[in-house]
């Protein structure tokens, strides 16, 4: 499937036709959620952030807005929306949630649920200086091109773990973020 000119309607119809299969087991992991913000344009974009270099975990890494589910959150979707508002000032009311991808286990012990949402193209992003050093948009068609991601096998504590690596402009996209983007591509039927 060729994605040089992926429209939002193409993306939505593929996503809705191929509903993700969710595994409800939490395996006693702490819960977290990220928002996968798809920017509503004729050629949609994928909104990403670069985390502040001053953070204790994942400093300087490219990421989706998101974080741990807290006691005030009614669901993982609510957590993703809250975190997106805190990190880049996306109002929850501006997000049209279209679904979730299967949860991903992080190396830090969280089970992270990716929440897919459509956002308007004219939102004035405002990065939280404590958490985010940059906000940028990548064309969705480029992000979903599986050939841009390269595998790296890491051995940690006796286990093999595959991570994916890619560049977009000056941004190094890798790890969980690259893995989630690849999962989104596979979910809508992109062939490896």
Curated annotation (Swiss-Prot):
EC number from the UniProt entry: 3.6.1.-
The protein's matches in InterPro entries, at most eight in alphabetical order, are given as: CoAse, NUDIX_hydrolase-like_dom_sf, NUDIX_hydrolase_dom, NUDIX_hydrolase_NudL_CS, Nudix_NudL
Q: What class of enzyme is it?
A: hydrolase
Q: Which cofactor does it need?
A: Mn(2+); Mg(2+)
Please state which protein family the record places this protein in. Answer: Belongs to the Nudix hydrolase family. PCD1 subfamily.
Residues involved in Mg(2+) binding: 83, 87
| Lineage of origin | Bacteria, Pseudomonadati, Pseudomonadota, Gammaproteobacteria, Enterobacterales
Q: Per its database record, what is this protein's job?
A: Probably mediates the hydrolysis of some nucleoside diphosphate derivatives.
Q: Which Gene3D superfamilies match?
A: Nucleoside Triphosphate Pyrophosphohydrolase
Give every Nudix hydrolase domain span: 29-160
Drop me one GO molecular function for this one: manganese ion binding
The name this protein carries in UniProt is Uncharacterized Nudix hydrolase NudL
Recorded name of the encoding gene: nudL
